[in-house]
Curated annotation (Swiss-Prot):
Pfam families: Glycos_transf_4 (PF00953). Its EC number is 2.7.8.13. The lineage of its organism: Bacteria, Bacillati, Bacillota, Clostridia, Eubacteriales. This is Phospho-N-acetylmuramoyl-pentapeptide-transferase. Catalyzes the initial step of the lipid cycle reactions in the biosynthesis of the cell wall peptidoglycan: transfers peptidoglycan precursor phospho-MurNAc-pentapeptide from UDP-MurNAc-pentapeptide onto the lipid carrier undecaprenyl phosphate, yielding undecaprenyl-pyrophosphoryl-MurNAc-pentapeptide, known as lipid I. Keywords: Cell cycle, Cell division, Cell membrane, Cell shape, Cell wall biogenesis/degradation, Magnesium, Membrane, Metal-binding, Peptidoglycan synthesis, Transferase, Transmembrane, Transmembrane helix.
Amino acid sequence: MKLNLPFNISPHVFVFILSFAFSLILGPVLIPMLTRLKFGQTVRDDGPKTHYKKTGTPTMGGMIFLIPVTVLAAFYAGHDRRILPLIFVTLGFGLIGFIDDFIKVVKKRKDGLYWNQKMFGLLLVAVTFAVYLSHTHTSDIIIPFMGMDKTVSLGWLFVPFVVLVLIASTNAVNITDGLDGLAAGVTLIVTVFFTIVAMTRSEWEYIKMFSAMVAGGCLGFLTFNAYPARIFMGDTGSLALGGAVGAIAILMKMPLILLIVGGIYVVEALSVMIQVLSFKLTGKRVFKMAPIHHHFELSGWKEVKVVLVFWTITVLLCILGFFALRLKFY
């Protein structure tokens, strides 16, 4: 159902602006509050020395965009209830991240939730979403570079595939969130991509709206998270963004396209897996430090340079994504 506005502005542009403005208002409220509560980030002892000064920077900043996205999407649900699964995944993953952050900063448990606790929560949300979709949506996915109408049915593999995509995307975004503005900027670009693609089909109206909300929230958050960051998104934000991006891609039948446009997420996650596997098998490290953004820092790149290069690569990957879909705008 299309949202009718009393003035001449595209609905997705309108919610983008609203989400952006809402996050701009929340930032100056949440940052001092989290600072007073001493909800500060703990920096890795083995990380780049330039990051030591970030110790104590308030975390859990993902609320700056998670709250606007949730509120706006909830209002939009009155027009189109199909947006509810997107809210469920994003808010569900975000709440798990919030609990994880809370344990880190309040209970002073460095790793937050235990691995099995966090994975149980993520799987619970992911499986619920996947089972719901198996009863309400087809199991088709679009094959890159074959056109948007070329799909393959996953059949009984659909549910485990959806779960895999959600768990992988949320962990990949979480890993990417290691430099000021990196995860938020990459996700902003990726969600703008999905917003544009969703404009090509009327049945994706609700996805277009939600993706625009996420993009607007990310842009607003970036004003506080760009170098030098005044706040970090924490797992509250990274898990929510990973869930949102994964769910959007699944509902648009584009998880394989996400591998392309979200190439930075993929490389970041792979760098960690390669590093761990190499060290276990050979006792040697492939990278100076993983994730790979730290490798570039230790190679002499400034933090801002790494972020800008990764943003630029994401823009180029999104252009490749358009070619992979062979979109026809008319």
